[in-house]
Amino acid sequence: MGRDVLNFNVDWLYIPEDLNDAYKFDFDESNFEVVSLPHANKTFPHHYFKEEDYRFVSWYRKHFKVDERYKGKKVYIHFEGVITVAKVYVNGEFVGEHKGGYTPFEFDITEYIKYGNFENLIAVQVDSREHKDIPPEGHLVDYMLFGGIYRNVWLKILNDTHIKDVYFVVDKLQDSVAEISITTTIAGKEISNGKILTEVINKEGVVCSSVVTDIKEMQKEIVQQIKMDNPLTWHPDHPYLYNVSVKLIAENEILDNYTFKTGIRTVEFRDDGKFYINGEPLKLRGLNRHQTFPYVGGAMPDRVQRKDADILKYELGLNYVRTSHYPQAVSFLDRCDEIGLLVFEEIPGWQHIGDENWKNIAKENLKEMILRDRNHPCIFMWGVRINESLDDHDFYKEMNEIAHKLDRSRPTGGVRYLRDSEKLEDVFTYNDFIYNLEGKIQLPNHKKYMVTEYMGHMYPTKSYDNLNRLITHARLHALIQDKQYGIPNMAGASGWCAFDYNTTSAFGSGDNICYHGVCDIFRLPKFAAHFYRSQADPHLYGPYVFIASYLIPSFEEENGDKLLVFSNCEEVELYINDKFVKRQMPNRVDFPSLPHPPFEFSMKECGINYMEVRVNNASITAIGLIDGKEVARHTLRPYGKPHKLILSCDDNEIMADGADCTRVVVSVVDENGSILPYANIPVSFEIEGEGKLIGENPLTLEAGRGAVYVKSTRKPGEIILKAKSHYVAEESNVSIKTKSIGY
């Protein structure tokens, strides 16, 4: 069909050294190791390491053949992301350079390659040192960049005349009719009798709408209009995706077929302060996401990136995420499209604005981000301002102009921490921390306004902190979300942040982690995570109930008489063992505006004495009721001694490409199967079969849990991960299959 896009991730050679002649064809490769992409230039423990250790220059080399049938075509090498400066060579010749680690780039390598059995060579020098001239660096940055070719690489083979880009935009959605514009950009030689055929295809493969347009002489940009009756729309609660096929045809031959998935929807912020999708108001409830994973930074395969989107949507109950503070993986956004998670995407940066060269790179980053992602229905706003930077009128005026020129369908935002900052963007997006410890945020000072950060550094909380802190942390998140729901002219609010993340020595708790997440760095929930999950609609996402406590004798006075229960049910019943204690309605006194306020039981009124429950080996159960019927339950039991290790993997099968991996969560439980929240015990691992361990060995659990990752080799087979600890009698294991990728 005129277009082949080949995965280029396997069989790379890597060396963590800066070697002068490593781009040359006949360079000695005996000291290189074989790796697959995505790849981190160095792995680390999940905390206590030096950022300087990943700041070095490394080389990647790959030998490859190009089939004879591709002679006469254009060949491009496409990188999704390389931290931070990439210099690319093919067969010893310099091809090009890219600066910036969060946006894609590609080079035309047609003139450098040979065909048939010839072993071509691509060599990439990756400079992951600090670059003060490239965003986000130049001053302190509250996150780590890491290093390597940490995203996918593709080899694209196209006809000489091909489709360079397609821009799909819903201009109007009203009265069950969608008016759509499709702009197709053509590159290469001029053709005769050319046509563009665009088809919008539903999930059943039925063409719902199509249009054919003749290409005029010298025309490089073709704009087509489509009207669709009764389209299935994209919405967070029903994210329908269509397949779009754009064919370039000449002399009855298909020269190119550019395909992608997208949704039919409109987004806008109105002067009443509300956010609207498809003409209906929607309160935005979200968190911020860093792409940092333990051990490898951002260098995780598509499977793990997609899993993060699932966690945000289904385990945290969100309808929106902000990609702080840079564009994130395409696979993450693809999954957000599929599951209906709205995204506020922003350019790389953190507080600092550099010189004119620095600004020019930021402008290029913005262009690359928008051109890459403007067909994603999940994205509802572009972040065109450096996070928390001071005003720069001329710079930000141009950034807004760039965004509006490249995409007329979305508003711009720019995240700041000063209320009197100049508003050049369409929406005033503000990080509001001042009154967080009172459970409050400020009222909007602009018509179009949303809060993009709250909490975070104001009340950092570790998963293994004392019970009182975990409860207070969760309650503050609940109070602030309640406040934003009670402000009708506030579009929404996103807390800081979803997951704990690695940071530089200038920030965090001194161990290279910012404990600002509602989940830990392994994506395991703290109490606050359960609050967010409880806000999801029970009829769409399932009923939920969680007792935010531990069944231990000691208890701090601050929350001593309250048993906090998060639930999206109408009522909650409390039981001691099987004995009914009380049925409670949600607390709409302290939380009048939340969709699903927490439930709070007075333990004295309920006759609950923690010590007596503990001594009598009793249990506490919360049962969630809808329409008077049980739909969910959660039980707390007194904690015993470490009894067993439980291994749980996200995926039972991964691909044998040498990079695919899955998270394995390790939990220590007592005889009742309860996770022991203060059992911070060491666990050792052994791995057998076609797999490798990513993570610490031994790993010290935190709050009774932790995680490692199991990565495939290039051979299909079975992986057995074994775990043991001298605190428990028996070894535990989990099995993961690896499947051939076919080459």
UniProtKB/Swiss-Prot annotation:
UniProt xrefs under Pfam families: DUF4982, Glyco_hydro2_C5, Glyco_hydro_2, Glyco_hydro_2_C, Glyco_hydro_2_N
Coiled-coil annotated residue ranges, if any: none
Enzyme Commission numbers on file: 3.2.1.23
GO MF, any single term: beta-galactosidase activity
Uppermost EC category: hydrolase
Oligomeric and partner information: Homodimer.
Described purpose of this protein according to its UniProt entry: Beta-galactosidase.
UniProt name for this protein: Beta-galactosidase
Gene of this entry: lacZ
